[in-house]
Amino acid sequence: MQDLQTAVWPLQCGFSHVDQMEFEMKKTALAATLLLACATVFAKPYPKYDVVKSVLHDQGFDGDAADKIREDLADHAGEYPPKFDNEADRKRAEKDAVTLARLYSGLLEQKIVTEKQPEQYRSVLHSIARLSWIAHNLDVPGAAAKADQHYRLLLAALPQKQRAGMRSEYGGFLASVGQTDAAVKMLNEAVQGGSDRSRLPLGMALLSQGKKAESLKQLRAYAKKYPQDERAAKFIDAVENGRFEVRRAEMPKR
């Protein structure tokens, strides 16, 4: 990796331990699929980046440029399956996600950012976790374990009052990699910590476990708190009327 400069531009972002072997062998995701009518979404082209040149230059590590690349990656591969116009775009995104995560890791490895800079340190951990989640969605070996590791480090580094929101995001990650029991536990902790928004993903995770009554309880509580979010009403209607199925979706090996 190209040496990182000592000047760092502002960095903006925003279960029990599962080892890499388990993540690598378990290429399935448990999904609760709601049979709701939805419009077909076509992927927009993924931009072309030279990640290293965009992020590293004489002034140091360009956090704004890194954020822009990560946002474009999230637009296309923030959920599984990824959305790309063609395989070439997908391959470039895979390379970009790995490269950008490596550059962020370099900030820690070279001690350019340390725990003595708590906000920047947490920002870097969060960026690596998110990029590794994206890389996992792109079927990069080892990415899920790396995301898990950095979410755990991030939670430990956060003040107690800030952990509920991050538990919600981490719970979403756990659900996405098929760790449904761990996801429910993490999302429950998020709700108990005051994150009412976590009730929606918690309801969906409970539905994945076949716990319809508990799922509806969380979905209804969410809908009451956030009546403007139409998703909750649609999910509740689908669950109540049996327009959903729980299935295992195989992630293709590459």
Briefly describe each language-model feature range.
Residues 103-122, 153-163:
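Flexible helix-coil transition and linker loops at the boundaries of alpha-helical arrays
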Residues 126-201:
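Alpha-helical adaptor scaffolds
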Residues 217-254:
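Terminal, low-structured helical/coil segments at or just beyond the last alpha-helical repeat
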